[in-house]
Amino acid sequence: MKPVRIVVLGAGGNSLGILDALMAANAIEPARPRYEIVGVLDDIPANLGRLVLGHEVLGPIADAAKLGDCRFVNGISSLESFRRIPEIVRRAGVAPERFETVVHPRATVSASARVGRGTSILAGSVIAPEAMVGDHVIILQNTSVNHHSRIGDHATLSAGITVLGYVDIGANAFVGGGSTLAPRVRVGDSAVVGAGSVVIRDVPAGRVHAGNPARELPRSQHALD
């Protein structure tokens, strides 16, 4: 079987983890690599030609449409950019089926879990039985999504998060590193949970909650609007 030719969107920190996952998959059987990593696309002009874990930034994201034999995965998501993930995916201008799901070999995904297109699950993370993860989700290292929990499309889960059972995280939400989400809580669409939070009550759509226990932050304490 020929290797899958793949391009990562974005040259930031999350892309390092995704490239690491691709390289780790290739290292399982070096004589028959799973992926051919073509390079990286990024919209920051200063990044053109830069190497990211040895892989060149080839051009802007709009160039994806010119790479007709490649698959893609999005690596762009930070507190500054996470709400633009749907726009970034659209800007690539390629069919939905050309987005690759990337799972690090040291991640664990239950056979009964469902994981969508274009989603990345990085090293040490666990997706438990009957969990559902949507399209274009980024799950960073050592994060656990427990049974029957649902992660909406375009959401970002940072490193070291514990999502307990029956949690519902909405589309385009962002959960900061080291947080714990108690069973059955809901984090609404485009909401933010600050790093290190303990969420024991629902977080409404578009709101920012942080702390232990997590409480809503007034707008004067964040710059996300």
Language model regions located:
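Structural signal for interior beta-strand "rungs" in well-ordered beta-sheet cores
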Residues: 101-217
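Phosphate-bearing ligand-interacting subdomains
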Residues: 45-108
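Glycine-rich adenosine-cofactor-binding loop
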Residues: 3-23
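NAD(P)-binding Rossmann-fold cofactor-contacting core
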Residues: 27-49
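Short, solvent-exposed amphipathic alpha-helical segments in soluble enzyme
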Residues: 22-26, 89-91, 225
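Short glycine-/acidic-enriched loop or helix-start segments at secondary-structure transitions
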Residues: 18-19, 50, 83-85, 203, ...
